[in-house]
């Protein structure tokens, strides 16, 4: 029954993607500092013309103005395009002026914070629809930290569900049904993403996600590092590493629910490397 949570979301996404593969790109950052080079790569990926504008969505954070201030300053060094702050609330989900601007943005940037807070505002609303329309029509959608986690259809919330459920940077156990997965934006349907990966040693968390969804590659992006996704092609940019778990073999559990398996594929990539999602 683990897919029940996503039944409505799948129907929602099928309606949006019925006209084919999205034309846009995803620029998924693992959190932490963003070097000038990484920001320049982001701007280059978006292929901004002089008339294009950038929308920042800061709803993940409790300090949206601060988050907007910092990313705006970084982007202004790399380009001269107009940068707009759209801090949607639940009352704004039908704001036609904002929604029209959002769906016609050439670059959308989602800040860090709490991915669940963001999705509580956006999920199954015209805001999500506008983001997906922009992406389908060729926009680049970028996100960092929480903004990275929510890119997937299957979003890691960071919560563990068994035993000590106090939030920790990583998981202290590998057990069945310990990881909480909720519905994300659905921009990345063929993989699950985690962030701050090497710095916060989130291997147990990502292995738990792989055990829950063994058919999906699970991607851990470290800080100051990004993956650039175009269709099924992925390129790595930035200062650190990207770890990918996939191809889990003979998954099973003991009587206490501990995860067991015989083999998996582990890949590590750095700046300039490319890999492929799917068969």
Regions found by a protein language model. Name each.
Residues 21-50, 69-70, 75-77, 156-157, ...:
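C-terminal and late-domain segments of enzyme folds
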Residues 101, 126-138:
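Catalytic-core regions built around general acid/base machinery
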Residues 1-22:
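Bacterial Sec-dependent N-terminal signal peptides
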Residues 21-111:
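N-terminal beta1-alpha1 cap of cysteine-dependent amidohydrolase-like domains
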Residues 115-124:
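Glycine/threonine-rich flexible loop motifs
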Residues 111-112, 135-155:
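Catalytic nucleophile loop
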């Amino acid at each position: 029954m683990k897919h029940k949570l996503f039944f409505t979301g799948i129907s929602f996404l099928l309606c949006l993607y019925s006209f084919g593969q999205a034309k846009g790109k995803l620029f998924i950052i693992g959190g932490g500092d963003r070097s000038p080079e990484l920001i320049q790569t982001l701007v280059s990926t978006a292929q901004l013309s002089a008339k294009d504008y950038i929308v920042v969505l800061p709803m993940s954070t409790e300090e949206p103005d601060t988050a907007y201030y910092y990313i705006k300053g970084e982007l202004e060094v790399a380009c001269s395009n107009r940068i707009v702050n759209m801090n949607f609330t639940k009352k704004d989900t039908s704001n036609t002026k904002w929604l029209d601007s959002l769906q016609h943005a050439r670059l959308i940037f989602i800040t860090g914070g709490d991915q669940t807070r963001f999705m509580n505002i956006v999920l199954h609303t015209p805001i999500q629809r506008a983001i997906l329309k922009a992406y389908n029509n060729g926009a680049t959608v970028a996100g960092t930290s929480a903004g990275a986690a929510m890119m997937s259809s299957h979003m890691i919330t960071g919560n563990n569900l068994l035993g000590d459920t106090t939030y920790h940077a990583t998981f202290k156990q590998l057990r069945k049904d310990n990881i909480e997965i909720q519905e994300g934006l659905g921009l990345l349907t063929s993989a699950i993403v985690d962030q701050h990966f090497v710095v916060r040693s989130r291997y147990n968390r990502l292995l738990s996600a792989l055990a829950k969804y063994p058919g999906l590659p699970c991607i851990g992006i470290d800080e100051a590092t990004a993956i650039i996704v175009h269709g099924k092609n992925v390129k790595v940019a930035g200062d650190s590493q990207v770890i990918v778990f996939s191809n889990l073999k003979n998954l099973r559990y003991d009587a206490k629910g501990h995860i067991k398996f015989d083999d998996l594929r582990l890949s590590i990539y750095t700046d300039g490397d490319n890999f492929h999602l799917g068969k």
